[in-house]
């Protein structure tokens, strides 16, 4: 079994990376392979609604979207992580996932998904809801928890202290 984790945060050792590394370590203990793909460090163009992905099965833009879809074909589940920017998921992960799901939704259907959001204080539930909609519109079971999957802090250290 393999789970693909997507980091939409801009910092390589930031709050989202810390949260996803924690998830990855728990998966490893459970005997589940995982891979973290980081997209927050590069510009991600939004979907322009051209429809070529419906015909070609991939986005015409040659960036990480098509490579992520290829990885998704071999994975059994997904976890998307994003910082909260103005009460929403990051622009990078939103643009990325819009194009991923327009281009390759068939490779996600029926596979479980979860998300984790990182914020200093507020906006987390709106961003959490936004990311979960990618799962629900695509017939993916949403992995639930006893509380919303969120971390609070402005640094790696603060996230690790967030109990």
What do the predicted segments below correspond to?
Residues 60-144:
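Helix-loop-strand module that forms the ligand-binding subsite of alpha/beta enzymes
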Residues 2-32:
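N-terminal beta1-alpha1 ligand-phosphate binding loop
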Residues 42-72:
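Cysteine-cluster motifs in flexible loop/terminal segments that predominantly coordinate metals
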Residues 33-35, 58, 141:
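Conserved beta-strand segments of alpha/beta enzyme cores
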Residues 1, 29-30, 67, 141-163:
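Glycine-rich phosphate/pyrophosphate-binding loop and the adjoining helix
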Residues 32-42:
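A short beta-strand-loop structural module common to alpha/beta enzyme folds
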Residues 13, 44-46, 123, 152:
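Generic structural signal for helix capping and beta-alpha/helix-loop junctions
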């Amino acid at each position: 079994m393999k789970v693909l984790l997507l980091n939409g945060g801009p910092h390589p050792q930031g709050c989202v990376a810390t949260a996803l590394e924690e998830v990855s370590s728990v998966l490893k203990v459970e005997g589940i392979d995982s891979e973290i793909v980081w997209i927050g460090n590069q510009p991600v163009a939004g979907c322009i609604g051209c429809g070529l992905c419906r015909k070609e099965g991939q986005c015409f833009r040659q960036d990480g979207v098509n490579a992520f879809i290829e990885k998704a074909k071999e994975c059994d589940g997904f976890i998307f992580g994003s910082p909260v920017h103005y009460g929403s998921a990051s622009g990078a992960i939103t643009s990325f996932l819009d194009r991923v799901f327009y281009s390759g939704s068939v490779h996600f259907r029926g596979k479980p998904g979860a998300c984790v959001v990182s914020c200093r204080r507020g906006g987390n539930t709106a961003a959490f809801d936004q990311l979960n909609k990618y799962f629900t519109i695509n017939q993916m079971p949403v992995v639930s928890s006893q509380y919303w999957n969120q971390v609070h802090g402005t640094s790696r250290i603060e996230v690790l202290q967030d109990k």
